[in-house]
Amino acid sequence: MSYAQTRTQTKAGYKAGVQDYRLTYYTPDYTPKDTDILAAFRVTPQPGVPYEEAAAAVAAESSTGTWTTVWTDLLTDLDRYKGRCYDIEPVPGEDNQFIAYIAYPLDLFEEGSVTNLLTSLVGNVFGFKALKALRLEDLRIPVAYLKTFQGPPHGIQVERDKINKYGRPLLGCTIKPKLGLSAKNYGRAVYECLRGGLDFTKDDENINSQPFQRWRDRFLFVADAIHKAQAETGEVKGHYLNVTAGTCEEMMKRAAFAKELEMPIIMHDFLTGGFTANTSLAHYCRDNGLLLHIHRAMHAVIDRQKNHGIHFRVLSKCLRMSGGDHIHTGTVVGKLEGDKDITLGFIDLLRENYIEENRSRGIYFTQDWASMPGVMAVASGGIHVWHMPALVDIFGDDAVLQFGGGTLGHPWGNAPGATANRVALEACVQARNEGRNLMREGGDIIREACRWSPELAAACELWKEIKFEFEAVDTV
């Protein structure tokens, strides 16, 4: 067949030009399928752009559409593959914002790939000129897609069985200063914190392998500290060894060395490291019996602005699919951003198996995790012993309460700082189990415990005036 004949035949069923997105991608009569991936976008259109057109543009640009009609549309079934905006909902109190609900057929996404999922949903559309701002508020991941992911390497119950600790939150500490310590001094700080009563210590997010402390030296000194602390206390101890590196090959080499040293847990910066690297590491951890702690470094660049970016509840869901046993979630009461209701919403999305839609907590869709293991929430950032009652009340048992400055800043040193936190935690758990109200009686509970612990009394005196009372930027 000649070129001229081909050109004539395509003309018969094809009309070139630009048409409104809403003619194809706005389908208010559509009923989402159980297998659809559903997305809730907060859309701020440019002045003069109708809501239906802006919403349809998001559906088009995040699925099959482009700016003009193309004749190759005739070579596929667009009705099968296109994203569809099926509902629009105004945002209360905002004149020019609305929530666009979009359904995507499952065929658009590669199985087991968070990287491909996000590349489609948020990879290009956020730069679209017709929009002033765009934020992905929530996703509903269907069971059919979830079953293509391994998820967390182990999950909450398996972790507790590995470390033999039940009925209370776990205690951690980020070693400070985060940069500048030699490997030997770093190991010393780890040992002091663990023998003082903590369950875990932690590399900070930006400790990798710098001139003042190469990764192999740090791993060796930390391993010595853990083995010594375990022998002295009779408890399983751990340190989150950060294996994040410049290449996946180097990252896996560091993970393998941690396993060789019989370390129970390693760590990854999942956003700066990337989802492909994180998923690979999670698979390695399951195969080799390592727990995987996840740091969310860079998250606020993506999630803090209320009208643009990706909400952390979406990043949390993506992390649970990609794989991690812990992830930092904020504290509500500490120095980092976090509205209480929203924080509790995405903590449930990390830990629970089935979560009902609850708009007061920012949950737009009911999510069934199909028995995928849960992720333990990590409360970290500006917390100290006076926060302990609120933290136990807010987070419950399946969490790691991580006191960095709140341990290492103790006036008597690292080990007494760890002891102060352990005593405060044990006092709060006992009081809760006896039926006392931690939010109302928390101060009294801590003061009573000070009578039996000079380490706790010294910590309480030091931090009695320290508060972080700022209004949350991101609210429902």
Swiss-Prot record:
InterPro entries linked to this entry: RuBisCO, RuBisCo_large_chain_AS, RuBisCO_lsu_C, RuBisCO_lsu_C_sf, RuBisCO_lsu_fd_N, RuBisCO_lsu_N_sf, RuBisCO_lsuI
One GO CC term on file? carboxysome
Question: Does Lipid biosynthesis appear among the keywords?
Answer: no
* A biological process term (GO) from this entry: reductive pentose-phosphate cycle
Q: How is the cofactor bound?
A: Binds 1 Mg(2+) ion per subunit.
Can you tell me which residues form the catalytic site? 176, 295
Keywords on this record?
Bacterial microcompartment, Calvin cycle, Carbon dioxide fixation, Carboxysome, Disulfide bond, Lyase, Magnesium, Metal-binding, Monooxygenase, Oxidoreductase, Photorespiration, Photosynthesis
The residues listed in the UniProt record as binding Mg(2+), with positions renumbered to this chain, are: 202, 204-205
Q: Where in the cell is it found?
A: Carboxysome
Which residues participate in substrate binding?
124, 174, 178, 296, 328, 380
Q: Name one GO molecular function term.
A: ribulose-bisphosphate carboxylase activity
Q: Name one Pfam family in it.
A: RuBisCO_large_N
- What is this enzyme's catalytic activity, as reactions? 2 (2R)-3-phosphoglycerate + 2 H(+) = D-ribulose 1,5-bisphosphate + CO2 + H2O; D-ribulose 1,5-bisphosphate + O2 = 2-phosphoglycolate + (2R)-3-phosphoglycerate + 2 H(+)
As for PTM, the annotation reads:
The disulfide bond which can form in the large chain dimeric partners within the hexadecamer appears to be associated with oxidative stress and protein turnover.
Q: Which residues carry this modification: N6-carboxylysine?
A: 202
- Predominant location category: other
Which family does the entry's similarity section mention? Belongs to the RuBisCO large chain family. Type I subfamily.
The record's note on quaternary structure and interaction partners says: Heterohexadecamer of 8 large chains and 8 small chains; disulfide-linked. The disulfide link is formed within the large subunit homodimers.
Additional free-text comment from the UniProt record: The basic functional RuBisCO is composed of a large chain homodimer in a 'head-to-tail' conformation. In form I RuBisCO this homodimer is arranged in a barrel-like tetramer with the small subunits forming a tetrameric 'cap' on each end of the 'barrel'.
List the protein's name.
Ribulose bisphosphate carboxylase large chain
Q: What gene is it encoded by? A: cbbL
